[in-house]
Amino acid sequence: MHNLTIAEISRKLQAKEFSSEEITRYFLDRIKQQDPTYNCYVTVTEELAMAQAKAADARLAAGNAPTMCGVPFAHKDIFCTNGVKTTCGSKMLDNFVPPYNATVVENYINEGAVMLGKTNMDEFAMGSSNETSYFGPVKNPWDTNCVPGGSSGGSAAAVAARMAPGATATDTGGSIRQPAALCGITGIKPTYGRVSRWGMIAFASSLDQAGVMARSAEDAAIMLNVMAGYDNKDSTCIDEPVPDYIANLGDSLAGVTIGVPKEYFEVGLNPGTEARVQDAIKQYETAGAKIKSISLPHSHLAVPAYYVIAPAECSANLSRFDGVRYGHRCDDPKDLMDLYKRSRGEGFGEEVKRRILVGTYCLSAGYYDAYYGKSQQVRRLIKQDFVDAFKEVDVIMGPTAPSPAFAFGSKGDDPVAMYLEDIYTIATNLAGLPGMSVPCGLVDNKPVGLQLIGNFFAESKLLNLAHQFQLATDFHTLAPSSLA
Protein backbone atom coordinates (compact mmCIF):
# COMPACT_ATOMS: atom_id res chain seq x y z
CA MET A 1 0.00 0.00 0.00
CA HIS A 2 2.90 2.38 0.62
CA ASN A 3 3.61 2.59 -3.11
CA LEU A 4 0.17 4.01 -3.85
CA THR A 5 0.10 7.61 -5.05
CA ILE A 6 -2.27 10.26 -3.70
CA ALA A 7 -4.37 9.94 -6.87
CA GLU A 8 -4.59 6.16 -6.43
CA ILE A 9 -5.41 6.39 -2.71
CA SER A 10 -8.13 8.94 -3.48
CA ARG A 11 -9.71 6.74 -6.15
CA LYS A 12 -9.64 3.66 -3.91
CA LEU A 13 -11.15 5.59 -0.98
CA GLN A 14 -13.95 6.88 -3.20
CA ALA A 15 -14.52 3.33 -4.53
CA LYS A 16 -14.62 1.98 -0.93
CA GLU A 17 -11.74 -0.46 -1.61
CA PHE A 18 -10.37 0.47 1.82
CA SER A 19 -11.18 3.06 4.47
CA SER A 20 -9.24 6.13 5.52
CA GLU A 21 -8.78 4.54 8.94
CA GLU A 22 -7.15 1.50 7.29
CA ILE A 23 -4.73 3.44 5.07
CA THR A 24 -3.92 5.87 7.90
CA ARG A 25 -3.17 3.02 10.32
CA TYR A 26 -0.98 1.43 7.64
CA PHE A 27 1.15 4.58 7.26
CA LEU A 28 1.35 5.15 11.03
CA ASP A 29 2.64 1.60 11.46
CA ARG A 30 5.11 2.15 8.63
CA ILE A 31 6.40 5.33 10.28
CA LYS A 32 7.00 3.38 13.52
CA GLN A 33 8.93 0.77 11.55
CA GLN A 34 10.95 3.04 9.21
CA ASP A 35 11.43 6.42 10.87
CA PRO A 36 14.03 5.36 13.46
CA THR A 37 16.32 4.84 10.43
CA TYR A 38 15.60 8.12 8.63
CA ASN A 39 14.46 10.62 11.33
CA CYS A 40 11.89 12.27 9.04
CA TYR A 41 9.32 13.14 11.71
CA VAL A 42 9.64 15.45 14.72
CA THR A 43 6.10 14.66 15.87
CA VAL A 44 3.76 11.82 14.86
CA THR A 45 0.12 12.74 15.51
CA GLU A 46 -1.32 9.24 15.84
CA GLU A 47 -4.48 9.99 17.85
CA LEU A 48 -5.33 13.08 15.81
CA ALA A 49 -4.70 11.22 12.54
CA MET A 50 -7.04 8.38 13.48
CA ALA A 51 -9.73 10.85 14.57
CA GLN A 52 -9.38 12.75 11.28
CA ALA A 53 -9.52 9.45 9.35
CA LYS A 54 -12.73 8.44 11.13
CA ALA A 55 -14.32 11.80 10.28
CA ALA A 56 -13.12 11.46 6.66
CA ASP A 57 -14.71 8.02 6.37
CA ALA A 58 -18.03 9.53 7.43
CA ARG A 59 -17.71 12.19 4.71
CA LEU A 60 -16.75 9.57 2.14
CA ALA A 61 -19.74 7.42 3.08
CA ALA A 62 -22.05 10.41 2.62
CA GLY A 63 -20.73 10.95 -0.93
CA ASN A 64 -19.33 13.98 -2.80
CA ALA A 65 -16.18 14.11 -0.65
CA PRO A 66 -13.26 16.25 -1.97
CA THR A 67 -10.33 14.59 -3.75
CA MET A 68 -7.96 14.51 -0.75
CA CYS A 69 -10.62 13.57 1.80
CA GLY A 70 -9.23 10.69 3.86
CA VAL A 71 -5.78 10.80 2.22
CA PRO A 72 -2.89 10.74 4.75
CA PHE A 73 -0.01 13.20 4.34
CA ALA A 74 2.54 15.15 6.42
CA HIS A 75 3.13 18.82 7.28
CA LYS A 76 6.55 20.44 7.44
CA ASP A 77 7.12 21.52 11.04
CA ILE A 78 7.11 25.19 10.04
CA PHE A 79 3.30 25.43 9.80
CA CYS A 80 1.43 26.25 13.00
CA THR A 81 -0.90 23.44 14.05
CA ASN A 82 -3.46 24.12 16.77
CA GLY A 83 -2.66 22.01 19.82
CA VAL A 84 0.26 20.23 18.10
CA LYS A 85 3.89 21.13 18.83
CA THR A 86 5.50 23.27 16.10
CA THR A 87 9.28 23.51 16.44
CA CYS A 88 10.67 24.88 13.15
CA GLY A 89 13.57 22.48 13.81
CA SER A 90 14.85 24.65 16.68
CA LYS A 91 15.52 24.38 20.39
CA MET A 92 14.02 27.87 20.55
CA LEU A 93 10.57 26.38 19.81
CA ASP A 94 11.13 22.92 21.28
CA ASN A 95 7.95 23.16 23.38
CA PHE A 96 5.90 25.68 21.38
CA VAL A 97 2.26 24.60 20.90
CA PRO A 98 0.39 27.11 18.70
CA PRO A 99 -3.16 28.15 19.63
CA TYR A 100 -4.22 28.32 15.96
CA ASN A 101 -3.76 26.67 12.57
CA ALA A 102 -1.86 28.13 9.64
CA THR A 103 -4.10 28.83 6.65
CA VAL A 104 -2.40 26.01 4.74
CA VAL A 105 -3.18 23.61 7.60
CA GLU A 106 -6.77 24.86 7.80
CA ASN A 107 -7.21 24.29 4.05
CA TYR A 108 -6.22 20.63 4.40
CA ILE A 109 -8.49 20.19 7.44
CA ASN A 110 -11.42 21.59 5.42
CA GLU A 111 -10.56 19.16 2.62
CA GLY A 112 -10.71 16.24 5.07
CA ALA A 113 -7.07 15.20 4.56
CA VAL A 114 -5.37 13.29 7.40
CA MET A 115 -2.21 14.68 9.06
CA LEU A 116 0.23 11.90 9.96
CA GLY A 117 2.66 14.26 11.72
CA LYS A 118 5.15 17.12 11.44
CA THR A 119 8.38 16.62 9.48
CA ASN A 120 11.96 17.47 10.42
CA MET A 121 13.71 20.43 8.80
CA ASP A 122 16.77 22.66 8.94
CA GLU A 123 16.47 25.07 11.86
CA PHE A 124 14.16 27.96 10.90
CA ALA A 125 14.48 26.68 7.30
CA MET A 126 18.14 27.78 7.14
CA GLY A 127 20.17 25.08 5.45
CA SER A 128 20.53 22.87 2.39
CA SER A 129 21.27 19.54 4.07
CA ASN A 130 18.96 19.14 7.09
CA GLU A 131 22.09 19.05 9.26
CA THR A 132 21.13 22.21 11.19
CA SER A 133 18.01 20.68 12.80
CA TYR A 134 17.97 20.62 16.62
CA PHE A 135 16.34 17.18 16.32
CA GLY A 136 19.21 15.64 14.38
CA PRO A 137 19.81 15.20 10.66
CA VAL A 138 17.41 13.42 8.32
CA LYS A 139 18.99 10.59 6.33
CA ASN A 140 18.52 10.24 2.60
CA PRO A 141 16.62 7.00 1.83
CA TRP A 142 18.76 6.49 -1.29
CA ASP A 143 21.96 6.51 0.76
CA THR A 144 21.81 6.92 4.54
CA ASN A 145 25.37 8.29 4.55
CA CYS A 146 24.14 11.26 2.51
CA VAL A 147 21.99 14.31 3.20
CA PRO A 148 18.40 14.57 1.92
CA GLY A 149 18.82 18.25 1.05
CA GLY A 150 17.15 21.11 2.87
CA SER A 151 15.51 22.82 4.39
CA SER A 152 12.49 20.55 3.72
CA GLY A 153 14.58 17.38 4.11
CA GLY A 154 12.11 15.64 6.41
CA SER A 155 9.22 16.10 3.99
CA ALA A 156 11.33 14.97 1.02
CA ALA A 157 12.74 11.89 2.75
CA ALA A 158 9.32 10.92 4.18
CA VAL A 159 7.83 10.90 0.67
CA ALA A 160 10.85 9.09 -0.81
CA ALA A 161 10.81 6.47 1.98
CA ARG A 162 7.06 5.95 1.43
CA MET A 163 6.21 7.17 4.95
CA ALA A 164 3.75 9.66 3.45
CA PRO A 165 2.35 9.87 -0.07
CA GLY A 166 2.79 13.65 0.00
CA ALA A 167 3.89 16.49 2.27
CA THR A 168 3.76 20.25 2.56
CA ALA A 169 7.04 22.16 2.40
CA THR A 170 8.42 25.68 2.04
CA ASP A 171 10.95 27.24 -0.29
CA THR A 172 12.96 30.41 0.43
CA GLY A 173 15.95 29.76 -1.85
CA GLY A 174 15.41 26.18 -3.03
CA SER A 175 14.11 24.36 0.05
CA ILE A 176 11.44 22.42 -1.87
CA ARG A 177 13.24 21.84 -5.15
CA GLN A 178 16.75 20.91 -3.94
CA PRO A 179 15.64 18.19 -1.45
CA ALA A 180 13.09 16.95 -4.00
CA ALA A 181 15.97 16.51 -6.46
CA LEU A 182 18.25 14.79 -3.93
CA CYS A 183 15.48 12.42 -2.77
CA GLY A 184 14.11 11.58 -6.23
CA ILE A 185 10.62 13.04 -5.81
CA THR A 186 8.52 15.82 -7.35
CA GLY A 187 8.33 19.25 -5.70
CA ILE A 188 6.78 22.56 -6.70
CA LYS A 189 7.31 26.07 -5.32
CA PRO A 190 4.42 28.25 -6.51
CA THR A 191 4.53 31.92 -7.49
CA TYR A 192 5.16 34.23 -4.52
CA GLY A 193 1.72 35.10 -3.12
CA ARG A 194 -0.06 32.09 -4.65
CA VAL A 195 -0.29 30.30 -1.27
CA SER A 196 -0.93 31.99 2.08
CA ARG A 197 2.01 32.42 4.47
CA TRP A 198 -0.26 33.13 7.47
CA GLY A 199 0.78 30.82 10.30
CA MET A 200 3.96 29.76 8.49
CA ILE A 201 6.93 30.68 10.69
CA ALA A 202 8.89 33.36 8.83
CA PHE A 203 12.52 33.15 7.70
CA ALA A 204 12.74 35.77 4.91
CA SER A 205 9.30 37.20 4.28
CA SER A 206 9.85 38.49 0.73
CA LEU A 207 11.19 35.09 -0.38
CA ASP A 208 9.30 32.42 1.64
CA GLN A 209 6.60 30.46 -0.18
CA ALA A 210 4.70 27.31 0.75
CA GLY A 211 4.49 24.43 -1.70
CA VAL A 212 4.20 20.67 -1.96
CA MET A 213 6.22 17.50 -2.31
CA ALA A 214 4.84 14.29 -3.78
CA ARG A 215 5.92 11.40 -5.95
CA SER A 216 4.31 12.66 -9.18
CA ALA A 217 3.18 15.86 -10.86
CA GLU A 218 -0.41 14.58 -10.72
CA ASP A 219 -0.18 14.26 -6.93
CA ALA A 220 1.44 17.69 -6.65
CA ALA A 221 -1.45 19.15 -8.66
CA ILE A 222 -3.98 17.55 -6.31
CA MET A 223 -2.20 18.98 -3.26
CA LEU A 224 -1.75 22.43 -4.79
CA ASN A 225 -5.48 22.55 -5.58
CA VAL A 226 -6.06 22.38 -1.82
CA MET A 227 -3.39 24.93 -0.81
CA ALA A 228 -3.57 27.70 -3.39
CA GLY A 229 -5.83 30.71 -3.07
CA TYR A 230 -6.29 34.16 -1.63
CA ASP A 231 -6.15 34.76 2.12
CA ASN A 232 -6.93 38.20 3.54
CA LYS A 233 -4.84 37.38 6.62
CA ASP A 234 -1.68 37.49 4.47
CA SER A 235 -1.08 40.91 2.92
CA THR A 236 1.32 39.42 0.34
CA CYS A 237 -1.22 36.82 -0.85
CA ILE A 238 -2.47 37.69 -4.34
CA ASP A 239 -6.19 37.66 -5.17
CA GLU A 240 -5.83 35.84 -8.47
CA PRO A 241 -8.26 33.08 -9.60
CA VAL A 242 -6.91 29.56 -8.96
CA PRO A 243 -7.24 27.19 -11.92
CA ASP A 244 -7.97 23.49 -11.51
CA TYR A 245 -4.41 22.19 -11.73
CA ILE A 246 -5.61 18.65 -12.52
CA ALA A 247 -7.71 19.78 -15.49
CA ASN A 248 -4.71 20.97 -17.53
CA LEU A 249 -2.44 17.94 -17.10
CA GLY A 250 -3.33 16.52 -20.52
CA ASP A 251 -2.20 19.47 -22.65
CA SER A 252 0.08 18.67 -25.62
CA LEU A 253 3.74 19.71 -25.73
CA ALA A 254 3.43 20.76 -29.37
CA GLY A 255 4.40 24.40 -29.84
CA VAL A 256 5.97 24.75 -26.38
CA THR A 257 9.31 26.60 -26.42
CA ILE A 258 11.79 25.60 -23.71
CA GLY A 259 14.59 27.98 -22.80
CA VAL A 260 17.89 26.49 -21.64
CA PRO A 261 20.12 29.06 -19.87
CA LYS A 262 23.78 28.69 -20.82
CA GLU A 263 24.75 30.02 -17.37
CA TYR A 264 23.23 26.91 -15.74
CA PHE A 265 25.66 24.57 -17.53
CA GLU A 266 28.97 26.22 -16.70
CA VAL A 267 31.60 25.58 -14.00
CA GLY A 268 30.56 23.59 -10.94
CA LEU A 269 27.95 21.29 -12.47
CA ASN A 270 28.50 17.57 -11.89
CA PRO A 271 29.05 15.88 -15.31
CA GLY A 272 26.61 13.06 -14.50
CA THR A 273 23.96 15.55 -13.43
CA GLU A 274 24.48 17.54 -16.63
CA ALA A 275 24.10 14.41 -18.76
CA ARG A 276 20.82 13.39 -17.08
CA VAL A 277 19.39 16.90 -17.40
CA GLN A 278 20.38 17.20 -21.08
CA ASP A 279 18.79 13.78 -21.73
CA ALA A 280 15.56 14.99 -20.14
CA ILE A 281 15.53 18.15 -22.26
CA LYS A 282 16.06 16.00 -25.38
CA GLN A 283 13.06 13.93 -24.30
CA TYR A 284 10.94 17.09 -24.45
CA GLU A 285 12.30 17.87 -27.91
CA THR A 286 11.36 14.38 -29.08
CA ALA A 287 7.84 14.95 -27.72
CA GLY A 288 7.39 18.07 -29.87
CA ALA A 289 8.78 20.96 -27.83
CA LYS A 290 11.17 23.50 -29.32
CA ILE A 291 14.50 24.02 -27.49
CA LYS A 292 16.10 27.47 -27.45
CA SER A 293 19.40 28.52 -25.85
CA ILE A 294 18.94 31.64 -23.71
CA SER A 295 20.98 33.81 -21.37
CA LEU A 296 20.21 34.91 -17.82
CA PRO A 297 23.21 37.26 -17.57
CA HIS A 298 22.91 38.16 -13.89
CA SER A 299 22.68 34.55 -12.65
CA HIS A 300 26.11 34.74 -11.02
CA LEU A 301 24.84 37.50 -8.71
CA ALA A 302 21.89 35.51 -7.34
CA VAL A 303 23.73 33.76 -4.50
CA PRO A 304 25.53 36.86 -3.15
CA ALA A 305 22.36 38.98 -3.40
CA TYR A 306 20.31 36.30 -1.65
CA TYR A 307 22.82 35.96 1.19
CA VAL A 308 22.40 39.64 1.98
CA ILE A 309 18.60 39.90 1.58
CA ALA A 310 17.64 36.63 3.31
CA PRO A 311 19.84 37.13 6.42
CA ALA A 312 18.68 40.75 6.68
CA GLU A 313 15.04 39.66 6.73
CA CYS A 314 15.88 36.76 9.04
CA SER A 315 17.57 39.15 11.47
CA ALA A 316 14.37 41.21 11.67
CA ASN A 317 11.97 38.23 11.81
CA LEU A 318 13.89 36.32 14.46
CA SER A 319 14.20 39.33 16.75
CA ARG A 320 10.76 38.34 18.12
CA PHE A 321 12.29 35.28 19.80
CA ASP A 322 13.56 37.00 22.93
CA GLY A 323 12.70 34.62 25.79
CA VAL A 324 9.85 36.83 26.99
CA ARG A 325 6.71 35.91 25.06
CA TYR A 326 7.19 32.38 23.76
CA GLY A 327 10.00 30.04 22.90
CA HIS A 328 13.06 29.06 24.92
CA ARG A 329 13.82 31.06 28.08
CA CYS A 330 17.12 30.76 29.94
CA ASP A 331 17.19 29.83 33.63
CA ASP A 332 17.66 32.49 36.34
CA PRO A 333 18.50 35.58 34.22
CA LYS A 334 20.30 38.34 36.13
CA ASP A 335 18.47 41.11 34.30
CA LEU A 336 16.54 41.79 31.08
CA MET A 337 19.66 42.01 28.90
CA ASP A 338 20.94 38.72 30.32
CA LEU A 339 17.54 37.16 29.54
CA TYR A 340 17.78 38.29 25.91
CA LYS A 341 21.40 37.24 25.42
CA ARG A 342 21.25 33.82 27.04
CA SER A 343 17.80 32.84 25.76
CA ARG A 344 18.82 33.60 22.18
CA GLY A 345 22.33 32.21 22.63
CA GLU A 346 20.97 28.91 23.98
CA GLY A 347 17.90 28.71 21.72
CA PHE A 348 19.44 29.31 18.29
CA GLY A 349 21.88 26.97 16.53
CA GLU A 350 25.14 27.98 14.85
CA GLU A 351 23.82 28.52 11.31
CA VAL A 352 20.90 30.63 12.51
CA LYS A 353 23.25 32.75 14.63
CA ARG A 354 25.56 33.19 11.63
CA ARG A 355 22.73 34.48 9.46
CA ILE A 356 21.37 36.78 12.17
CA LEU A 357 24.86 38.29 12.56
CA VAL A 358 25.29 38.76 8.80
CA GLY A 359 21.81 40.24 8.46
CA THR A 360 22.21 42.63 11.38
CA TYR A 361 25.54 43.82 9.96
CA CYS A 362 24.02 44.40 6.51
CA LEU A 363 21.20 46.47 8.02
CA SER A 364 23.43 48.54 10.30
CA ALA A 365 24.02 52.26 9.83
CA GLY A 366 26.62 52.96 7.18
CA TYR A 367 26.24 49.54 5.52
CA TYR A 368 22.53 49.44 4.61
CA ASP A 369 22.91 51.11 1.21
CA ALA A 370 26.15 49.32 0.35
CA TYR A 371 24.76 45.85 1.06
CA TYR A 372 20.97 45.60 1.44
CA GLY A 373 20.14 48.44 -0.95
CA LYS A 374 22.60 47.20 -3.57
CA SER A 375 21.28 43.62 -3.28
CA GLN A 376 17.73 44.80 -3.91
CA GLN A 377 18.98 46.54 -7.06
CA VAL A 378 20.60 43.27 -8.18
CA ARG A 379 17.35 41.47 -7.39
CA ARG A 380 15.51 43.72 -9.87
CA LEU A 381 18.12 42.94 -12.55
CA ILE A 382 17.68 39.19 -11.98
CA LYS A 383 13.90 39.53 -12.22
CA GLN A 384 14.26 41.52 -15.45
CA ASP A 385 16.41 38.72 -16.93
CA PHE A 386 13.46 36.36 -16.48
CA VAL A 387 10.93 38.90 -17.79
CA ASP A 388 13.02 39.27 -20.96
CA ALA A 389 13.47 35.49 -21.30
CA PHE A 390 9.75 34.79 -21.04
CA LYS A 391 9.11 37.05 -24.02
CA GLU A 392 10.81 34.33 -26.11
CA VAL A 393 10.14 31.05 -24.26
CA ASP A 394 7.28 29.37 -22.37
CA VAL A 395 9.35 27.65 -19.71
CA ILE A 396 12.99 27.51 -18.60
CA MET A 397 14.74 24.21 -17.82
CA GLY A 398 18.04 23.25 -16.24
CA PRO A 399 19.49 21.36 -13.28
CA THR A 400 17.90 21.70 -9.85
CA ALA A 401 21.10 21.07 -7.87
CA PRO A 402 24.76 21.04 -8.98
CA SER A 403 25.28 17.41 -7.88
CA PRO A 404 23.45 14.43 -6.37
CA ALA A 405 23.22 14.01 -2.59
CA PHE A 406 26.51 14.61 -0.76
CA ALA A 407 27.89 12.97 2.37
CA PHE A 408 27.09 14.21 5.88
CA GLY A 409 29.74 16.61 7.14
CA SER A 410 31.34 17.13 3.73
CA LYS A 411 30.32 20.81 3.55
CA GLY A 412 29.76 21.63 7.21
CA ASP A 413 33.03 23.52 7.62
CA ASP A 414 32.53 25.62 4.49
CA PRO A 415 29.32 27.69 4.59
CA VAL A 416 29.92 29.07 1.09
CA ALA A 417 30.13 25.56 -0.42
CA MET A 418 26.81 24.77 1.28
CA TYR A 419 25.26 28.02 0.04
CA LEU A 420 26.23 27.12 -3.55
CA GLU A 421 23.94 24.07 -3.32
CA ASP A 422 21.14 26.51 -4.18
CA ILE A 423 22.94 28.21 -7.06
CA TYR A 424 20.27 27.19 -9.62
CA THR A 425 17.21 27.69 -7.41
CA ILE A 426 17.77 31.02 -5.63
CA ALA A 427 17.08 33.30 -8.62
CA THR A 428 13.53 31.96 -8.87
CA ASN A 429 12.80 33.10 -5.31
CA LEU A 430 14.39 36.50 -5.87
CA ALA A 431 12.11 36.98 -8.89
CA GLY A 432 9.02 35.48 -7.21
CA LEU A 433 8.52 32.93 -10.00
CA PRO A 434 7.18 29.36 -9.74
CA GLY A 435 9.74 26.56 -9.91
CA MET A 436 9.56 22.80 -9.91
CA SER A 437 11.88 19.79 -9.69
CA VAL A 438 11.14 16.40 -11.24
CA PRO A 439 13.29 13.25 -11.12
CA CYS A 440 15.20 12.71 -14.38
CA GLY A 441 17.55 9.81 -13.66
CA LEU A 442 20.28 8.49 -11.39
CA VAL A 443 24.01 9.14 -11.00
CA ASP A 444 25.85 6.53 -8.91
CA ASN A 445 22.41 5.27 -7.82
CA LYS A 446 21.45 8.70 -6.46
CA PRO A 447 18.65 10.81 -7.96
CA VAL A 448 19.03 13.87 -10.17
CA GLY A 449 16.37 16.58 -10.55
CA LEU A 450 15.34 18.55 -13.63
CA GLN A 451 14.25 22.09 -12.75
CA LEU A 452 11.35 23.77 -14.54
CA ILE A 453 10.85 27.53 -14.09
CA GLY A 454 7.67 29.24 -15.26
CA ASN A 455 6.33 32.73 -15.67
CA PHE A 456 4.19 34.24 -12.91
CA PHE A 457 1.17 32.03 -12.07
CA ALA A 458 2.23 29.41 -14.65
CA GLU A 459 1.95 26.52 -12.16
CA SER A 460 -0.53 24.74 -14.47
CA LYS A 461 1.98 24.83 -17.32
CA LEU A 462 4.80 23.49 -15.13
CA LEU A 463 2.62 20.69 -13.75
CA ASN A 464 1.48 19.77 -17.26
CA LEU A 465 5.06 19.70 -18.60
CA ALA A 466 6.18 17.59 -15.64
CA HIS A 467 3.21 15.23 -16.04
CA GLN A 468 3.91 14.72 -19.75
CA PHE A 469 7.55 13.89 -18.93
CA GLN A 470 6.41 11.42 -16.26
CA LEU A 471 3.99 9.73 -18.67
CA ALA A 472 6.96 9.07 -20.98
CA THR A 473 9.51 8.06 -18.30
CA ASP A 474 9.53 6.08 -15.06
CA PHE A 475 12.12 8.02 -13.03
CA HIS A 476 9.46 9.28 -10.59
CA THR A 477 8.43 5.69 -9.82
CA LEU A 478 11.93 4.56 -8.80
CA ALA A 479 12.34 3.71 -5.13
CA PRO A 480 15.48 3.38 -3.00
CA SER A 481 16.64 -0.25 -3.01
CA SER A 482 16.98 -0.22 0.79
CA LEU A 483 13.24 0.30 1.35
CA ALA A 484 11.27 -2.50 2.96
Curated annotation (Swiss-Prot):
GO terms for molecular function: ATP binding; glutaminyl-tRNA synthase (glutamine-hydrolyzing) activity. It catalyses: L-glutamyl-tRNA(Gln) + L-glutamine + ATP + H2O = L-glutaminyl-tRNA(Gln) + L-glutamate + ADP + phosphate + H(+). Heterotrimer of A, B and C subunits. This is Glutamyl-tRNA(Gln) amidotransferase subunit A. Allows the formation of correctly charged Gln-tRNA(Gln) through the transamidation of misacylated Glu-tRNA(Gln) in organisms which lack glutaminyl-tRNA synthetase. The reaction takes place in the presence of glutamine and ATP through an activated gamma-phospho-Glu-tRNA(Gln). The keyword Nucleotide-binding applies. Its EC number is 6.3.5.7. It comes from the Bacteria. One of its GO terms (biological process) is translation. The active site is at K76, S151, S175. Keywords: ATP-binding, Ligase, Nucleotide-binding, Protein biosynthesis. GO terms for cellular component: glutamyl-tRNA(Gln) amidotransferase complex. The keyword Transport does not apply. The gene is gatA. Belongs to the amidase family. GatA subfamily. It comes from Teredinibacter turnerae (strain ATCC 39867 / T7901). Gene3D superfamilies: Amidase signature (AS) domain.
